[in-house]
Amino acid sequence: FKTGDVLAIKFDDEYGICFVSSVDEGPRRLEYNLACTRLLQKEKPSIDDFLSSKIACGKQDTSYCLKTDCWFNHKDLGQLIDRFEKIGRVELEDYVLGTLAPASTLDDIYNQITLNKKTWNLKFKDTRELIKAFETDERTVVNDK
């Protein structure tokens, strides 16, 4: 996966959706940060579902500050690879990772998607606000918000 890839996630009875917020490569190390949206649904999500979803984030100066994260090493993410399907790619507005949450299972992703808004003092924005442009196999679109 590459930064900006939009991924549908297959849980047992429903789907979620996330994007790769960063890929960190170093000597003998490859790690992925996945930013999860609040979307859970029965059908496989589309890029339009992703754009219509909400994400935990705020503003930090002129950048968006993501408040959702699942931080996987290459080995752990590789064991779940059959649960992910790339459905598109996004170019994002400037952002920083405001949270780093180690993850190794599908439950870790599900827990990020369903974090309690009040307990964790989360604010949500329309995912579309963070997107400069997106592409699928069928089309490339610059977001006019």
Q: Which residues does each predicted region cover?
A:
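Basic/aromatic-rich interaction segments and small domains that mediate binding to polyanionic partners
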Residues: 22-48
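Short coil-to-beta transition motif at edge beta-strands of beta-rich domains
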Residues: 1-11
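Beta-strand-rich cores of mature extracytoplasmic or soluble domains
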Residues: 50-144
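Short beta-strand-centered aromatic/proline hotspots
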Residues: 14-24
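Hydrophobic beta-strand residues in large extracellular and virion-surface proteins
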Residues: 7-9, 20, 34
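Short, surface-exposed beta-edge/turn micro-motifs
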Residues: 3-4, 15, 31
